[in-house]
A protein has these predicted regions:
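A charged N-terminal "starter" segment
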Residues: 1-170, 190-191, 217, 221-222, ...
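C-terminal active-site-proximal or functional interface alpha/beta core segments in diverse enzymes
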Residues: 10-12, 236-317
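Domain-wide signal for the mature, well-folded portions of proteins, strongly enriched
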Residues: 40, 48, 113, 206-209, ...
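A non-catalytic, amphipathic alpha-helix used as a structural packing/dimerization or gating element
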Residues: 58-66, 214, 250-253, 303
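Active-site beta-loop-alpha junctions enriched in small/polar residues
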Residues: 84-90, 109-110, 130-132, 150-154, ...
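Active-site-proximal beta-alpha loop/turn segments in soluble metabolic enzymes
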Residues: 141-143, 178-204, 229-244, 270-296
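Active-site glycine-rich loop that binds ribose-phosphate moieties when present
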Residues: 152-156, 213-214, 302-306
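Metal-dependent enolase-superfamily TIM-barrel catalytic cores that perform enediolate-based chemistry
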Residues: 168, 201-219, 245-253
Length: 317
């Protein structure tokens, strides 16, 4: 499983000219049919049958580039984008992500396997998930992935496995943030309606402030474990920008608390995903979140970068 990430030239993207454009690479052609890039979807269905999943490589690349640029243009620091492999764990898309310089968020053995098979740099991969099995931990440690942990027991298991394998391992700590300021913000999720705080408290696992301090202190005493980051995932429960800014601010506040109580300042904060995507008015299924009026990437990036910079300066981090 060799590392081929970033070894190829940048792929040039050329927008298409449609009669009616849904994006630069999807639209209605002059013949009245739906087109994806240079392909008439009706002709594709005739050849491959229906239902048919079609992905625009150019749209995929463009979206990644726009998202990353929004943050690199607004944040005065290092930015790394991790693709959520669970969204589509195909070998082809993972290879495209490698070409674009994207890392990866992995759940389980299969997602790690595909990422490594595609030649992804293991240092850009993170293993997430609750109740990780020893098989997953061994695979992550053997290949040099960072592991986001959420319990003292998991820290102990990682220590034992890394010692057995004679490997060092980077870890992150998944936080259970106190999002009190979102108690009056309504959100939606697969578990039903409720405020964003209620949804977060009931569905997001992780460590409390006190538990985080305890686990950091324990990790500092283990020679083969290196602390890398803290992590939180708000999830796709709203398309408003401010809740994500609240989450980012709280993560920096926790960084200060951790530093004051352990001497360790997290060099990286992983702010998770859940970003709402926009779509053409009247297309696609209706959902509880208003995708048709979603903020743009730049809206998220400007506000979140502003908040992180303000809080970091406030606490001299």
């Amino acid at each position: 499983m060799g590392n081929s990430q970033n070894s190829e030239k940048i792929v040039e993207l050329v927008p298409k000219d449609y009669k009616l454009s849904y994006s630069d690479f999807v639209g209605i052609g002059n013949n009245g049919n739906l087109w994806v890039e240079d392909c008439d979807v009706e002709e594709l269905v005739k050849e491959y049958g229906s239902p048919l999943l079609i992905i625009s490589e150019s749209q995929f690349r463009q979206s990644f580039r726009q998202f990353k640029k929004a943050f690199t243009d607004n944040y005065n620091g290092e930015v790394e984008i991790l693709y959520a492999n669970k969204s589509n764990n195909s070998l082809a898309l993972r290879h495209i992500m490698n070409q674009e310089g994207g890392g990866g968020d992995c759940f389980g053995v299969n997602e790690m396997y595909i990422s490594l098979l595609a030649g992804t740099n293991p240092k850009t991969l993170v293993l997430n998930g609750s109740n990780k099995q020893d098989e997953e931990l061994e695979m992550a440690i053997s290949n040099g992935l960072c592991i986001n942990i959420d319990s003292m027991d998991e820290l102990s298991r990682i220590s034992n496995i890394s010692t057995k394998l004679n490997k060092t391992v980077e870890i992150g700590i998944r936080l259970a943030l106190d999002l009190d300021s979102l108690a009056d913000k309504t959100g939606v999720s697969m578990h039903g309606p409720g405020t964003l705080k209620e949804q977060s408290d009931s569905t997001k696992w992780g460590m409390s402030r006190e538990q985080t301090v305890e686990i950091v202190k324990a990790a500092q005493q283990i020679e083969n474990i290196h602390l890398k980051e803290t992590h939180f995932h708000l999830s796709r429960m709203t398309n408003e920008v401010e809740p994500f800014a609240v989450m980012a601010r709280e993560m920096v506040t926790w960084s200060h608390y951790i530093k004051e109580n352990t001497g360790w300042t997290p060099p990286c904060i992983d702010i998770g995903g859940g970003w709402t995507y926009g779509r053409w008015y009247g297309t696609g299924p209706n959902s509880q979140i208003d995708d048709q009026n979603a903020p743009k990437y730049i809206d998220y990036a400007k506000r979140i970068s502003e908040v992180i910079s303000e809080e970091a300066a406030k606490y001299d981090l």
